[in-house]
Swiss-Prot record:
Sample GO molecular function, one term: metalloendopeptidase activity
The UniProt record lists the keyword Transmembrane helix: yes
UniProt protein name: Protease HtpX
Subcellular location: Cell inner membrane
Residues binding Zn(2+), per UniProt: H139, H143, E222
Xref: InterPro entries: HtpX_protease, Pept_M48_protease_HtpX, Peptidase_M48
Enzyme class, first EC level, given as a word: hydrolase
Any one of the GO CC terms: plasma membrane
Gene from which this protein is expressed: htpX
Family designation: Belongs to the peptidase M48B family.
Any Pfam family: Peptidase_M48
Lineage of origin: Bacteria, Pseudomonadati, Pseudomonadota, Gammaproteobacteria, Enterobacterales
Species, as recorded: Yersinia pestis (strain Pestoides F)
Active-site feature positions: E140
Length: 293
């Protein structure tokens, strides 16, 4: 949940910075078409910047260490498991990292299917059986194979575009109204302070509301990743892994952008703002075979 939240906050920060630069430099769009083009460039730009930086940010945020050569039997097993599953789904071998954390957790990130990263916590390796850990790894490999990183980036780009467009359109109307240009015929954006204040507040508010859409897609992809894991290692192993997660506690380590975690418990947000479905729903979906068809 933290990783997705930070990805959204990064996009929001990029939009706010772009908006600040435009307002300070006096660059404003005088037409709806121009505003839409600007919103698209900045909206998708923020999302793709986050995607391109995702591996670096992920490793930096959790203090992960990429395994170059296995130093013990656990690291050897982890590399071989990732290699075998990658071959099964037809993707290049991802980088594999381990990070120090007591929580049972793992994530996948990266800009491309064939240039990805899979990281697991020491808590996962210490507290899960090999079968359960294998299922979690298969879940992350399924995220990569399904192209979920790029899918979520495109969705975020569309959401960003509409947030910027609607916010600045309303801000331009409000600024023009207060400056006496109630017909919107002037090329001037109106009162620049009003324009800046309204656009920044609306981008923040609409960005938070738009995260509901992004979170819905994220939850949808989690069901498919669970199903992908079940196909790779067996349904019972994935169910066992999720049941083990029910006994774990909420992960607290710092997050990273565009990462897909296995641990989806949440105690502080309603389901609308959850990046993962409740664990009971994920287990039920696996038992019913809803996403295995």
């Amino acid at each position: 949940m933290m990783r997705i939240a930070l990805f959204l906050l990064t996009n929001l920060a990029v939009m706010l910075v772009f908006g600040l630069v435009l307002s300070l430099t006096g660059i404003q769009s005088s037409s709806v078409q121009g505003l839409m083009i600007m919103a698209g460039l900045f909206g998708f730009g923020g999302a793709f910047v986050s995607l391109l930086m995702s591996k670096w940010m992920a490793l930096r945020s959790v203090g992960g260490e990429v395994i170059e050569r296995p130093r013990n039997e656990t690291e050897y097993w982890l590399l071989e498991t990732v290699r075998r599953q990658s071959q099964q789904v037809g993707i290049a071998m991802p980088q594999v990292a381990i990070y120090q954390a007591p929580d049972i957790n793992a994530f996948a990130t990266g800009a491309r299917r064939d240039a990805s990263l899979v990281a697991v916590s020491t808590g996962l390796l210490q507290n899960m059986s090999r079968d359960e850990a294998e299922a979690v790894i298969a879940h992350e490999i399924s995220h990569v194979a399904n192209g979920d990183m790029v899918t979520m980036t495109l969705i975020q780009g569309v959401v960003n575009t509409f947030v910027i467009f609607i916010s600045r359109l309303i801000a331009q109307i409000a600024a023009g109204f207060l400056s006496g240009d109630r017909d919107g015929e002037s090329n001037s954006p109106g009162n620049p302070m009003v324009y800046f204040a309204v656009s920044m507040v609306l981008e923040l508010v609409f960005g938070i509301l738009a995260s509901i859409i992004t979170m819905w897609f994220s939850r949808h992809r989690e069901f498919h990743a669970d199903a992908g894991s079940a196909k790779l290692v067996g349904r019972e192993k994935m169910i066992a892994a999720l049941q083990r997660l029910k006994t774990s506690y909420e992960p607290q380590e710092a997050g990273s952008m565009m990462a897909f975690c296995i641990n989806g418990k949440s105690k502080t947000f309603s389901e609308l703002f959850m990046s993962h479905p409740p664990l009971d729903k994920r287990i039920e979906a696996l038992r019913s075979g809803q996403y295995l068809k």
